[in-house]
C-alpha cells in the first residue's frame, strides 16, 4: 500500500512488525500539490517500491493500493485515471499484471453516504474478475475478521454449502479470486453494501443482507428471509432458545438493570439500546454519532424510553463533558468506559465480530460476568 497522505492514522500501524514492508509513503511538497506534479510521481514510486521488495527478497504483491486523503478530494483528482496510468507504466516489464487501485481515506466523507470504509471494501472486491459460478459456494462479506463458531456457518453447511468464503480466511491471492465463483453473497455489515451492489452488477452475484442486530426476533426473521432466498431450510429454534435463556438469566439475576452504551463496540449503539429496552432492561445514556439510518431506532427509543439521553461523540462540546452522573449499573463500549470510569464495563470490541444468536448470548454472558466480578 502506497500512502499519499498525512499518515496520522497509519504511521502507528505501519510500525508494527507484521506490517513491515507492506506500507510505504510518498513524500510531497506544497509546490508539487499546487502544480499537480505529485500525480506524475506515483507510477515511479510504485515501481520503486516493487523493486525494493524484489531486491530484498520480499514477496511481490499482486495488487497495490494507493491510499489518498482529503488533499486530492479538495483538488478533485481523478484517482481511477491515475491508477490506470500506473498500471500502464508496469505493462511490458517484470511487474506487468499487478493491479493498482485507489483507496479513498477522506475524513471529510466520514459522515456522508460513502465513508472511507465503504470505499475500502468496494476497492478490495473490485479486484475480483468473472469466473464460472459454483452453486455450492457463498461469500460472507463485510468484516475483516472471520465469523467463527457462529450458527450462520452451521446453517449454510447443513444446507449443503461446501465453500463459505471470507476475505479474512483466504490464505493466498488466488483463494481470494475464487470468491468470484460464489452463487450469492451474504452482507453482514452495511458498509459492504456498495461492494455487494458492484459485484452484482459486474459479476452477476446477487446478495442478501443480514444485519448485525441484538433482537432475537429480528435475527429469526433474517434467517427466515435467507432460507427463502437461498432455497434452504434453517431451523434456528435451539439457538434462539439459548439466546433467550441467556437474556432471562441476566434479567433474573439483575432485575431493573440500567445500561450506558457507546459506539466503540461491535454493535449499532442505537439498535443495541432499543433491543435491550425491549428485553426489559433500561438505558440511561447513549454515546454515539447520529446518522440518518439510525433515525428509526431513535424514534422507537423516544416512544419506549423517553428519558434516555443521547450524546454525540463528534460534538466538540463533549470535551467539557464531566464524568457521567448516571445511575447505570454497567456500560458497553470503550468510549462508555471513558465517560463512566467507575461503572463495570464490557468493551465488546473484539476483532472477531459477534453475530446472530451467538452475539446475543455472548454479550449477555459477558455483562453477567462483569457484574458478578464487580460484586454487583
Regions found by a protein language model. Give the residues of each.
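An N-terminal assembly and electron-transfer interface module characteristic of large anaerobic redox
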Residues: 1-376
Amino acid at each position: 500500500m502506497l500512502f499519499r497522505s498525512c499518515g496520522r492514522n497509519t504511521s502507528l500501524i505501519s510500525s508494527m512488525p507484521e506490517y513491515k514492508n507492506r506500507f510505504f509513503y510518498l513524500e510531497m511538497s506544497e509546490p508539487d500539490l499546487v502544480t499537480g506534479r505529485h500525480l506524475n510521481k506515483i507510477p515511479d514510486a510504485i515501481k520503486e517500491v516493487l523493486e525494493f521488495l524484489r531486491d530484498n527478497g520480499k514477496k511481490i504483491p499482486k495488487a497495490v493500493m494507493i491510499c489518498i486523503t482529503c488533499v486530492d478530494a479538495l483538488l478533485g483528482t481523478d484517482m481511477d485515471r491515475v491508477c490506470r496510468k500506473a498500471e500502464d507504466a508496469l505493462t511490458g516489464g517484470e511487474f506487468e499484471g499487478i493491479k493498482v487501485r485507489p483507496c479513498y481515506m477522506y475524513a471529510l466523507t466520514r459522515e456522508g453516504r460513502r465513508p472511507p470504509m465503504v470505499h475500502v471494501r468496494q476497492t478490495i472486491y473490485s479486484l475480483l474478475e468473472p469466473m464460472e459460478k459454483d452453486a455450492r459456494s457463498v461469500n460472507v462479506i463485510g468484516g475483516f475478521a472471520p465469523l467463527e463458531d457462529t450458527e450462520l456457518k452451521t446453517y449454510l453447511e447443513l444446507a449443503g454449502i461446501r465453500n463459505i468464503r471470507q476475505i479474512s480466511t483466504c490464505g493466498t491471492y488466488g483463494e481470494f479470486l475464487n470468491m468470484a465463483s460464489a452463487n450469492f453473497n451474504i452482507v453482514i455489515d452495511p458498509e459492504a453494501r456498495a461492494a455487494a451492489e458492484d459485484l452484482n452488477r459486474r459479476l452477476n452475484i446477487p446478495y442478501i443482507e443480514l444485519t448485525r442486530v441484538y433482537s432475537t426476533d429480528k435475527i429469526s426473521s433474517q434467517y427466515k428471509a435467507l432460507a427463502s432466498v437461498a432455497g434452504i431450510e434453517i431451523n434456528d429454534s435451539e439457538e434462539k432458545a439459548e439466546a433467550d435463556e441467556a437474556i432471562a438469566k441476566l434479567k433474573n439475576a439483575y432485575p431493573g438493570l440500567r445500561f450506558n452504551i457507546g459506539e466503540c463496540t461491535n454493535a449499532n449503539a442505537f439498535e443495541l439500546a432499543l433491543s435491550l429496552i425491549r428485553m426489559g432492561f433500561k438505558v440511561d445514556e447513549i454515546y454515539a454519532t447520529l446518522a440518518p439510518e439510525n433515525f428509526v431506532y431513535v424514534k422507537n427509543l423516544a416512544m419506549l424510553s423517553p428519558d434516555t439521553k443521547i450524546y454525540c461523540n463528534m460534538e466538540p462540546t463533549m470535551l467539557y463533558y464531566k464524568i457521567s452522573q448516571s445511575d447505570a449499573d454497567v456500560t458497553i463500549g470503550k468510549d462508555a468506559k471513558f465517560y463512566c470510569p467507575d461503572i463495570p464495563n464490557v468493551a465488546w470490541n473484539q476483532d472477531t465480530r459477534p453475530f446472530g444468536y451467538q452475539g446475543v448470548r455472548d454479550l449477555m454472558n459477558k455483562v453477567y460476568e462483569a457484574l458478578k466480578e464487580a460484586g454487583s
